[in-house]
Amino acid sequence: MRRIAVFDAPSNLGLRPPTATSVPGCAKGPGALRDRGLVERLSARDAGCLTPPRYDPGDWRPGDGVAQASAISLYSVRLADRIEETIDEGEFPLVLGGDCSIIIGAGLAMRRRAQASDERIGLVYVDGHSDFRHQGNASYVGAAAGEGLAIVTGRGQPDLAAIEGRRPYFRDADVVLIGIRTHDGYRMDLEAAGIQALPVPKLRAEGAGRSVQWVRAQLAGCSGYWLHVDVDVLDPAVMPAVDAPDPGGIAYPELELLIGGLVSSPGCLGMQVTVFDPDYDLDGAHAGALTESLLAGLHPLLVSGHPPASATAATPAARRTSDPPITTPQPAVGTV
C-alpha cells in the first residue's frame, strides 16, 4: 500500500477579500489540521509546505479577468511539480489547502501524466458548489476558486486554463461532481457540457456506498483520478468555517464514506482538501471534527506496519446531532 505524503498548499489567491482590510483565512487551514495531529496520526510523511505568492488583488475590477491570475499560474506550475514528484516516489499526495484554485495545479499534474502515458485521468470533485462560472455563462469572472472546475475543463483565460499549452486538464466526460446543492446556478451548464453531477438529494437517495460505485463506473475509461474535497460540501450546521457556507449539505459520516470508498481504489492518485477557514473557528472545534473525519475517511490508505499514532485515528469523535439545521443561506463572501 502507498504511504501518504502530506504537504500544505496554503494559497488563498483564488478568493476575494472577506473585508476591505483582511485576507481570506483559508491559508491557515493546513496549520489548524496539523495542530490536531493529522500528519502524525496518519503515520504520513511530512512533505512540508509549498509557500504561495503574496496575496494582493490590487485594484482589480469586474472585467479585468481572474484576479491574481499571474500569481495563481506560477503557483500552479510549482504545485504540479510537487504533486508529480510525490506520485513518482510511489506515495499518495494529500494536499492541504488553501482555496479551490489549487485544483489548477493538480489538474496540470494529472494532464502531464495523462499525456505522457497516452491515457485519460479523471477528476472526482466533491464540493458544495459547481465552481463552473466562466466567461461563457457569467457577466464577468474574478475569483478563481469560484471558477476552478470551469478552468480545469478548459473554460478560461489561457494563463490559467492552458498552462504549458495543455488545455483542458480534464475532459468533460472524465469529471464527476458530487455534493452540489439543488439550487446551484450552473447545473444546466454542467448538463449541457456532459459533466455528470450528483446533487445532495440524489446522493442521499442512493447512499454513499452506491454513489461511490456509480462514480467509479463513470470513470471506468480512465487509468486513474484525482480527488478534490471542498469542506463546504458539508452542511453549515456541522461545518460553518468556510468562505461560502450553503445549506443542504452532507454530514460527516457521509463524507467519511465517500472519501473512504474513493481513496480505497488503486486508481485514486491523490487528494486535496480545501476551503477550511480557521478564522470562523474560534475555539478550534471544527478543526477537530474535520481532522477526525479525514482520519476516518483516509483509513483505507494506512500503510501496513505504520499504524496510526492514536487509537482514535480511524474513529470519528462524537459529534453533536442536536444542532438545528441551518435554513438561511449565509453570504458567499469569498468566491464572487
Where does each model-flagged region fall?
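Catalytic cores of soluble, metal-dependent hydrolases
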Residues: 2-94, 103-106, 113, 185, ...
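Active-site flanking residues adjacent to catalytic metal/cofactor-binding acidic residues
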Residues: 7, 98, 126-128, 178, ...
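Active-site histidine-anchored catalytic micro-motif
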Residues: 88-162, 265
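Residue-level recognition of the N-termini of beta-strands and the immediately preceding loop/turn
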Residues: 120-122, 173, 225, 268-269
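Short, structured patches in soluble enzyme cores that scaffold and shape functional sites
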Residues: 125-128, 153, 177-182, 199-201, ...
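Short secondary-structure boundary/capping segments
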Residues: 141, 166-168, 187
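Phosphate/diphosphate-binding glycine-rich loops and adjacent basic-rich segments that engage nucleotide
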Residues: 155, 161-181
